[in-house]
Amino acid sequence: MAKLILIGGVSRSGKSSLAQYLAQHLPHATHIDQDEFVLPAQQIPKINDRTDWETPESIDWQQLTAKVKESLNSYNYVLLEGIFAFQNEALNNRADLKVMLKLPKEEFLVKRRKEQRWGEEPEWFLEHVWKAHLIHCNPHQTAIDLTFKSIQPKEFSKIQDKIELLP
């Protein structure tokens, strides 16, 4: 039976890097990036003058869960990563392993300020991103199997080892 691995954490915590590494190193694995299931901006709530990507309402959950189910029928390992990785109870219940990547707030702010994907972001918005993470990172208080703080790529193989030991 295919294994579902959920990887959650705040923006810039290393979720995508970890999932990409695991997809390359685990046999017959696929990486699903939650960002690929964001709704069109006009359907997402706003905060001040900005699209609020930091709310679970920004995700097309129906399409995302359908993709996960389809992938579980096609791969040995399905790696779902995103800021809302633990938001969906059905996925939480199906998951074989839940990995949380944490960053101290100061490190998050430094990394996010360097991010230029959306241009320079105002400080109030960075604070909003952090607060939204605290609210939405694990709303169901799901038991997390592995937690890493400020993970480094050299530690990725430790997670791979744990995954390969799953029954």
What are these regions (language model features)?
Residues 24-35:
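Post-Walker A helix-loop "phosphate-sensing" segment adjacent to the P-loop in P-loop NTPases
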Residues 13:
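ATP-binding Walker
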Residues 49, 97-140:
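A glycine- and Lys/Arg-enriched "phosphate-lid" helix/loop adjacent to the NTP-binding pocket
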Residues 78, 97-100, 145-147:
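Short, well-ordered beta-strand core segments
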Residues 16:
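Walker A/P-loop
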Residues 2-5, 21, 25, 74, ...:
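NTP-dependent small-molecule kinase module
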Residues 30, 39-82:
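Conserved nucleotide-sensing/catalytic segment adjacent to the nucleotide-binding pocket
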Residues 10:
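P-loop (Walker A) phosphate-binding loop of NTP-binding proteins
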